[in-house]
């Protein structure tokens, strides 16, 4: 486990260094043009994260289909809950799985681990050397540098970039508390300038939000994000 963790950490550093080394200093604008837009509706009303990944895979030239990814690659756990000996509500890990059915309005959400697994299993099946990397915790400077490098970033945000409201949650079998909010959303960051960001949204399409609004919401979701890298 130690070696694996060291490799992942080293890989993250390499990603950031690769991004820094190819940047123009003080760049104020960058956008990925002709980015494919895929709408999650009507097939996947709660499948925003996997639809965001579908867009990124299509950007890299893969024949990815959202429903194929959702039902053949995305780790899914049934929405089964119970109370433990301490009377705590317990259920599946929202980070590792999509909880529920993304094809219904009753589905919940999933985290970066689930999206990375779906991406990596798909990429392996395609015989690709690309792989997904969880870069959660990235700084905003580093985040925007990926866009300058024409690397789209799957980001965990909120629907319509609204401030995150009240959350609900439960404990996993390992005792970790996981939470979700009704309007939790996944999308793709594809551009930015001094005042705004451009988002490829699985519901709204290509849309701009103020940079301050985006950064506030992105931070409220823990700076969670994923990229694909060779």
Give the label of every model feature segment.
Residues 64-86, 126-133, 216-217, 223-230:
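Cysteine-dependent hydrolase recognition
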